[in-house]
Curated annotation (Swiss-Prot):
Enzyme class: ligase
SUPFAM superfamilies: Acetyl-CoA synthetase-like (SSF56801)
Stored Gene3D superfamilies: 3.30.300.30, N-terminal domain of ligase-like
CDD domains linked to this entry: ACS
GO annotation, cellular component aspect: cytoplasm; cytosol; mitochondrion; nucleus
PROSITE patterns associated with the record: AMP_BINDING
Phosphothreonine: residues carrying this PTM: T596
GO terms for biological process, alphabetical: acetyl-CoA biosynthetic process; acetyl-CoA biosynthetic process from acetate
InterPro entries: Ac_CoA_lig, ACAS_N, AMP-bd_C, AMP-bd_C_sf, AMP-binding_CS, AMP-dep_synth/lig_dom, ANL_N_sf
UniProt keyword list: ATP-binding, Ligase, Nucleotide-binding, Phosphoprotein
Reactions this protein catalyses: acetate + ATP + CoA = acetyl-CoA + AMP + diphosphate
Annotated positions binding ATP: G395, E396, P397, D419, T420, Y421, W422, Q423, T424, D510, R525, R536
Organism: Schizosaccharomyces pombe (strain 972 / ATCC 24843) (Fission yeast)
Protein name: Probable acetyl-coenzyme A synthetase
Length: 662
């Protein structure tokens, strides 16, 4: 959140669409009144609303008669459960039949001008061949396949090939360590892992196959490894009998493989997210409801049309890439960007050169990137961006000053800005403006999407707070199609995390306010999760990595405000007797986090001190947050602490840590 006062009254009307321009399609939604009418129907009669939308946007092998059953309260909701559908047919085949030469994937390689376009006809052939290769490796209906790949077209081809077989993909972000890869592979008992010899990002070459080789020493379920050669010359260490080069096996298979037909509640993919216990949770998204949520939000939030070119600069290792690089755009038959590089390579104009080169119509990035480019200066925003209609922000609340720069400088005051709020577990947007019609308030996610019965709950009583101009915890009262159904092999964990805190509601974990106009403002996490550059990490996960070092007796991790990344990790460390805080020890502790989770999780500061504990032994992170924020006068009641005097020691330790050079 911004440290400056927020103007809750500033309203920016959505830009007027250029009428009479044949290159600009008619908006998918006409007015704010139409949104209000559709929203009311989606809440009051969800079966009719979502049933009509599913029939309109999806091709069914067997029509459903029941739209939704079950409830949030019982964690048993299901959508279109008596129907049957082929997800890959919906994503690829039907567009390859209707518009075979339309562009499906826009590959922007790390080095500018080295990418390529892939049509829907070509995508169907490549996906079919990859599916055939995986089938020859023993992959079939319901099997799990891991993907640890760079942002290249073959990654999306692999995802779709797995889906084509009715198997379940588990994409692992290519910045995770070998230990993190092994944890995810073992939890889901993957049969095959797909990787590349290396990735290219920001002019650097990063080995991937070596990480996989190390991980697989602990992964007994993996039988085959499919390896794409991203380097000019093969560099990977291959294991005979287990590892297969992509270029050796893929061409051997036919360019058409029949797509699997599945029940709409069949798992489409697993995606691991941070858990409060430190063990990542395999969030399960199911086919019918998830695909509908992805398609509907793309259609109405981004005003995406089949002739559009969607630009999302995310990574498929996270939910943003799943929903708004792969599944949403392809469901609508649009072209979608596969961006391998960084916003600063070779310079800070890279994003805007991509927009100009490919004539992108939507642009979707995180506030971290927006802040980075805002700092770099307006001189880099020099490319033709006239093709853009809707800008989007994702991952964390966007500060009003960054919103205004995005709107005024990047969008030239003619593009709507959608500040989208959602989570891995929600599958698609839950609070957001609809690009063509919603008046914008810088800093606010605005209004609930269709079917999202959003409520503000009093955290003390657990009761709904009615009316506007209220603050509390954000929760959802009714099922929606794209919601995760469970945690892989851990339904009790799903219930404990999302449903038990406030029975009868889905708990988002975020605090929120609803202003006098009914607009929702996200205030940040109320549970033990940090948000770094839009990526959520459990504090327990980082603490466990620190505790793996022999010197650490206890640790407590908190997130602190950071102008660039949103939050940064600060770690409080209590050392075992006989150990001293040295520069060398600090390096070892940071390396422990890097090697266990990944470099992006590294603590910004290590603070060596005792910890504020209650008499029952619970660490009071609230006190640590207040001290780090310089709000010592707002710490409040210390009577529950076992030793209130420890607070003074922590204040001195924080002061000392701040004096040290970073």
């Amino acid at each position: 959140m911004t440290k400056n006062p927020v103007d809750h009254t500033l309203i920016i009307e959505p830009p007027v669409r250029l009428h009479g321009d044949p290159t600009v399609p008619k908006p998918n939604i006409a007015s704010l009144d139409e949104y209000k009418r559709m929203y009311e129907e989606s809440i009051n009669d969800p079966s009719t609303f979502w049933g009509n939308m599913a029939r309109d946007m999806m091709t069914w092998d067997k029509q459903f008669s029941t739209v939704v059953q079950g409830s949030i309260d019982k964690a048993d909701s299901a959508w279109f459960a008596d129907g049957a559908i082929s997800p890959c047919y919906n994503l690829v085949d039907r567009h390859a039949i209707a518009r075979p030469d339309a562009v499906a994937l826009i590959y922007e390689a790390d080095e500018p001008n080295q990418g390529r376009y892939i049509t829907y006809r070509e995508l169907l052939a490549s996906v079919s061949q990859c599916a055939g290769a995986l089938q020859s490796m023993g992959v079939g209906m319901g099997d799990r396949v891991a993907i640890y790949m760079p942002m290249i077209p073959e990654t999306i081809i692999a995802m779709l090939a797995i889906v084509r077989l009715g198997a379940i993909h588990s994409v692992i972000f290519a910045g995770f360590s070998a230990e993190s890869v092994a944890d995810r592979v073992n939890d889901s008992e993957c049969k095959v892992i797909i990787t590349a010899d290396e990735s290219h990002r920001g002019g650097k070459r990063i080995p991937l196959k070596g990480v996989v080789n190390k991980a697989l020493t602990e992964c007994p379920t993996i039988k085959k490894v499919l390896v794409f050669q991203r380097s000019a010359e093969p560099t990977a260490s291959m294991v005979e009998g287990r590892d297969v080069w992509w270029h050796d096996i893929i061409p051997k298979f036919p360019r058409y493989c029949p797509p699997a037909v599945v029940n709409p509640e069949h798992p489409l993919f697993l995606l691991y997210t941070s858990g409060s216990t430190g063990k990542p949770k395999g969030v399960v998204h199911c086919t019918g409801g998830y695909l509908l949520g992805a398609a509907a939000t793309c259609k109405y939030v981004f005003d995406l049309h089949p002739t559009d070119r969607m630009g999302c600069a995310g990574d498929v290792g996270w939910i943003t890439g799943h929903t708004y690089i792969v599944y949403g755009p392809l469901m609508l038959g649009a072209a979608t960007l596969v961006f391998e590089s960084t916003p600063a390579y070779p310079d800070y104009s890279r994003y805007w050169s991509v927009v100009e080169r490919h004539r992108l119509t939507q642009w979707y990035i995180a506030p971290t990137a927006i802040r980075l480019l805002q700092r770099a200066g307006n001189e880099f925003v020099k490319h033709d961006r006239s093709s853009l209609r809707v800008l989007g922000s994702v991952g964390e609340p966007i500060a009003p000053e960054s919103f205004m720069w995005y709107y005024e400088v990047v969008g030239e005051k003619r593009c709507a800005v959608a500040d989208t709020y959602w989570q891995t577990e929600t599958g698609s947007h839950i609070v957001t403006s609809l690009g063509p019609v919603t008046p914008m308030k810088p800093g606010s996610a605005t209004l609930p999407f269709f079917g999202i019965d959003a409520v503000i709950i009093d955290p003390l009583t657990g009761k709904i707070i009615e009316g506007n101009d209220v603050e509390g915890v954000l929760a959802i009262r009714s099922p929606w199609p794209s919601a995760a159904r469970t945690v892989w092999r851990g339904h009790d964990r799903y219930i404990d995390t999302y449903l038990k805190p406030y029975p009868g509601f889905y708990f988002t974990g975020d605090g929120a306010t609803r202003d006098k106009d009914g607009y929702i403002w996200i205030r940040g996490r109320v549970d033990d999760v940090v948000n770094i550059s839009g990526h959520r990490l459990s504090t327990a996960e980082i603490e466990a990595a620190l505790l793996s070092h022999d010197a650490v007796a206890e640790s407590a991790v908190v997130g602190v405000h950071d102008e660039l990344t949103g939050q940064a990790v600060n770690a409080f460390i209590l050392l075992k007797p006989g150990y001293e805080a040295t520069v060398e020890l600090e390096k070892e502790l940071i390396m422990a986090v890097r090697s266990t989770i990944g470099p992006f999780a590294s603590p910004r500061k290590l603070i060596f001190s005792d910890l504020p504990k209650t008499r029952s032994g619970k660490i009071m992170r609230r006190i640590l947050r207040k001290i780090l924020a310089g709000e010592v006068d707002q710490i409040g009641d210390l009577s529950t602490l076992a030793d209130p005097k420890v607070v003074e020691h922590i204040i001195h330790a924080v002061h000392y840590a701040h004096q040290k050079k970073p």
